[in-house]
Amino acid sequence: WFAGGKGLDGFRQEMLNDKRVRILTDFENSADVFPGVDVAGGICYFLWARDEPGLCKVVNFHNGERIESERPLNEFPIFIRHSKAIPIVRKIMAINAKENNHRYLNERVSSRKPFGLPTNYTPQHAGIPCWFTQRIGLKYAAKEDVSDNANLLDKWKLLIPPYPIAGQTDFSKPVGFYYEGNVRIAKPGECCTESWLVAYASNTKEEIVSFKSYLFTKIVRFLLLQAVVSQHVTRERFCFVPDLGTYSGRYTDAMLREQWGITDEEWEFIDSKISTVEEPSDE
């Protein structure tokens, strides 16, 4: 319930705004509580003190380390589980407010079914080139079945899967999200089914390649992780990732560390949470 879950929005807001939740203990790895049991997203328990409202003591257990902090649960619209991540997110959001006027990628990434085609749409023999599942690849969709309400069809597009970490339920281990093998660059005139989200669209391929290098950095994927507690990654999960507006050149973690003032200690934590992926290609 920290960040997602079907039908849990009301419950989450009630919990985050309840100052009587005084202690919240969080285990990323469910096996730390129930050995041999795999519970996706981990385990938490909390103390609700009816007559003693105040700040909440958040206790994180991460790779055998116990970390405590006191903080308001409703500082953000979702609950960031890691206390070590809070100052990093705060810092980057403050800089983004000055440099990019509070713009984040949750306003840029497409919603599900960007072209109105469901995952089970049947490939056609002719029509508009369409990216289906990774197994099927590039086939065709009938022109009359394709909608383009967001005016994406005639642009270059970076396609990303909505389930980039399928199979991973233990979030105490490093998370990858995106890499060369699970993203696609779609040309102008190509669409996709619900098997993809359009992460970014541009009039030039060069800007798409540049944006891909931004998405592949560990810092950006770390910011995404703060809003992800399941294998399903929707546009809303990008709420902490700054949208730089336009993209040029190749982005690196060293560049973003300097821009956002990430310390060595903060980088060590980021590096421990996000797995390394290969350098992004130009294709």
Label every model-predicted segment.
Residues 265-283:
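Short, amphipathic C-terminal "tail helix"
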Residues 31-268:
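C-terminal substrate-recognition regions of SAM-dependent nucleic acid methyltransferases
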Residues 1-31, 45-46, 211:
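Conserved Class I SAM-dependent methyltransferase catalytic core
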Residues 2-3, 166-169, 277:
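Flexible loop/turn segments at secondary-structure boundaries
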